Amino acid sequence: MTSFLCSDTEIESDGGISRCKKIKNKPLMEKKRRARINKSLSQLKQILIQDEHKNSIQHSKWEKADILEMAVEYLQQLRSAQPCSLSPSTSSISTPPTPKEEIRNIKVPLNPIASFLNPMMQQYVAYQQLAQLSMYTQLFNNPAGVPLRADAGVTAQSPELAEKLKIEDRSRV
């Protein structure tokens, strides 16, 4: 490995990587990093100014550490005002919901549907009860085997008894 003095045209040959370029780029990278930090701090300062509503004389005296401390306090206030359902530490490790929780999660969206269907279900149940009452009333009032409905040939008695009753009805006429 040959070593040269670092100048604009001289390069140390070490696998095609220039040590001189790395050394020269380091201050430039540091300058860019500091510029990003200062830009972010000024943005934080503007956010805090809008939130704090303090006069501009005090704003110019804020140090970088003050800005960071106030930003942390501000974020903590926001977090306490609006608690998250899952904290970052528990979001990756989640336990499966219990059956009661699953049922609760299912019931909540079904409540509007149930309130919509409830009157219709009540009407349907009332209709079924009326139909049963009507059928029982007909059976109670017609024990002799008279057809339950005019359009149906169904009788309450055996077919032999029904035939016998038909013959008796014809003889009366």
UniProtKB/Swiss-Prot annotation:
UniProt-listed Pfam families: HLH
Molecular function terms from GO: DNA-binding transcription factor activity, RNA polymerase II-specific; protein dimerization activity; RNA polymerase II cis-regulatory region sequence-specific DNA binding
Location of region: Disordered: 83-102
Ranges for region Basic motif: 21-34
Span list, region Helix-loop-helix motif: 35-78
Biased composition (Low complexity): 83-95
Tissue: Expressed mostly in the seam (stem) cells and hypodermis (hyp7), but also to a lesser extent in the intestine.
Deletion phenotype: RNAi-mediated knockdown leads to an increase in seam (stem) cell number variability.
Compartments (UniProt record): Nucleus
Domain spans labelled bHLH: 21-78
Swiss-Prot/TrEMBL GO biological process terms: anterior/posterior pattern specification; epidermal cell fate specification; negative regulation of gene expression; nematode male tail tip morphogenesis; regulation of neurogenesis
GO CC annotations on file: nucleus
PANTHER family hit by this protein: BASIC HELIX-LOOP-HELIX TRANSCRIPTION FACTOR, HES-RELATED (PTHR10985)
Protein name per Swiss-Prot or TrEMBL: Helix-loop-helix protein lin-22
Organism: Caenorhabditis elegans
GN (gene name): lin-22
